[in-house]
């Protein structure tokens, strides 16, 4: 067993034939993959393809309709708090920031040493006394991601880190994710719409189309076949040009 929950060859998280959705109605169908320690998997696709729905199921926030999820010995029906105890950190689309607290107190209330986050994002050092509500969107995301990574999770789920942020900030965030995988052995599953940037940091890419696997590629193959990956987005809508429910 490695420090981050898998064997030397085995996965940290294993997903088999996962179907999940809302009110008993499947949105995601028959999804299967493994993620090993130190590996970054990127789930790609347009709005409504089922990416966030998948993440909610992996975190234990949505029920599995069929299939299995195994993470650190915890099955797919375990809620988020039990998974967190086993080393899961989940960065959602909504940045989890206490707006009335300083950046420093936002970290301390989460049990994180601010210095560990400064090591990841040195630009935050001069902002430690600033209230969360006065931080820029990029600074808030650095706070949220830094807090998650400072806990040295076995598994990081990161949903749309790049949402609404400048390209340079997105690079800083994705570099921190890659560093955590490489140096700490964190297994990472991240959701992104913007393939070009995300694929620079990815070992494995899955394009979800209408709730199903459209493409399943190594990171290297996905980078070589970027036009095909992007074409998969364009064919992930219904006949009226609208995405399926997320």
Regions found by a protein language model. Give the residues of each.
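ABC ATPase C-loop
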Residues: 148-149
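Conserved ABC transporter NBD signature motif
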Residues: 66-77, 86, 114-115, 119, ...
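The feature captures the beta-strand-to-loop junction immediately N-terminal to the Walker
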Residues: 44-46
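Helix-to-loop junction immediately C-terminal to a conserved catalytic motif
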Residues: 59
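ABC ATPase NBD coupling module
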Residues: 63, 75-95, 126-129, 222-229
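C-terminal boundary and immediately downstream tail of ABC-type ATPase nucleotide-binding domains
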Residues: 2, 119, 204-216, 223-246
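Conserved ABC ATPase signature
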Residues: 131-135, 139
């Amino acid at each position: 067993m490695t420090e981050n929950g898998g064997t030397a060859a085995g996965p940290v998280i294993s997903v088999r034939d996962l179907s999940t959705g809302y009110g008993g109605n499947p949105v995601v169908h028959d999804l299967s993959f493994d993620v090993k320690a130190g590996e970054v998997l990127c789930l790609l696709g347009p709005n409504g393809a089922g990416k966030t729905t998948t993440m909610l199921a992996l975190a234990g926030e949505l029920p599995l309709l069929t299939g299995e999820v195994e993470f650190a010995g915890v099955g797919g029906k375990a809620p988020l708090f039990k998974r967190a105890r086993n080393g899961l950190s989940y960065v959602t689309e909504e940045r989890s920031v206490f707006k009335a607290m300083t950046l420093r107190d936002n970290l301390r209330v989460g049990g994180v040493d601010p210095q560990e986050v400064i090591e990841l994002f040195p630009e935050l050092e001069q902002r430690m006394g600033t209230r969360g509500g006065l931080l820029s969107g990029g600074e808030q995301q650095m706070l949220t991601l830094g807090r998650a990574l400072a806990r040295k999770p076995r598994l990081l789920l990161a949903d749309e880190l790049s949402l609404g942020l400048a390209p340079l900030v997105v690079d800083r965030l994705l570099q921190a994710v890659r560093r955590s995988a490489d140096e700490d052995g964190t297994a990472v599953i991240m959701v992104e719409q913007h393939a070009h940037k995300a694929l620079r940091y990815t070992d494995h890419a899955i394009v979800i189309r209408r709730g199903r696997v459209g493409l399943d590629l190594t990171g290297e193959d996905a980078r070589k076949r970027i036009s095909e990956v992007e074409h998969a987005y364009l064919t992930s809508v219904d006949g009226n040009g609208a995405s399926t429910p997320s």
